[in-house]
Each structure stands twice: as structure tokens, then as C-alpha cells.
Amino acid sequence: IIVEPNSIRRKYLNDKCHVISVEKVDQFFSIVVDAVGFKKTREIASAKVSPGGVITHIGLGEDTGGIDVRRITLQEVSFIGTYTYTAGDFMDTAQAIFDGRLGPLDWIERRPLSEGNTAFREIREGKIASPKVLLSPNC
């Protein structure tokens, strides 16, 4: 289950990626992955992990806020930060993109470098579907 508050991205995920994407969940999960790393996503992860469960944090959106330290401590939740890959992993992933093995990449929006601030603001405000914007000086 992917929790996605942005209705534009949620529709894209459900229609094109064959996953279950919802705005919010009521149940608890033994493993929660925060791939975004904003205060709000850490709040959701902290609230929805089962007692004794694990939060795996890979998102680097913001550096503070969102963790309910009291709940994590009392309910013995493990918090694991992970952000590593080898040069070989990077090369394999790049080759998979170039070979088209990751499917269509129409979810990546391309914009001129000069629109960088606007693009990041629109991502945070949920105004665009794309979670990634490729900025290029030649776009």
C-alpha cells in the first residue's frame, strides 16, 4: 500500500503502476518505509507502525520533525536510516533506465533550470503529479 496525499500522483499510481495507492490508512503495519522524508511523512510513519515494528527511512526531504519519539520508545519501534548504494548499483540502475527495463518514465517532468525553485515549490504543495523534476539548462 502506498500512502500518497497528492491526488494527482495517487491517480497516476493507481492507473499506470498497478499498485494500491490511498490518501490515508487506518491500519498499522509492521514495516513502514518513508521514501520521502518530510515532517508529514515521518508523522504518518511514526503513527502507523505497529508496536515492535520497523520504520525504514530513506527520504531526505527535510532534516527535522515528525518523529513521535515517546511512542517509538514506549512501543519499542526500530528506526533504521538507509541511504547507500555502490557504484555498481548506480551503473546497473542507469543501464536499466537506458534499456527501458524500468518501464515508461513519463512520471518524470522536465523543466528549464531557471524554473527550479518553482518546480520544487509545486512538488511540496502537491500541484504537480511528478515526484521528480529533471532540470536542464537546455530544456
Predicted regions and their residues:
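C-terminal hydrophobic helical "lid"/dimerization subdomain
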Residues: 43, 87, 91-139
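Residue-level detector of short coil/turn "hinge" positions at structural boundaries
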Residues: 19-21, 79, 103-104, 130
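A general structural-boundary detector
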Residues: 32, 59, 80, 103-106, ...
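Glycine-rich cofactor phosphate-binding loops and adjacent beta1-alpha1 units
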Residues: 7-78
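Glycine-rich beta-alpha junction loops
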Residues: 6-7, 37, 61-62, 85-86, ...
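Rossmann-fold dehydrogenase core element
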Residues: 54, 67-106
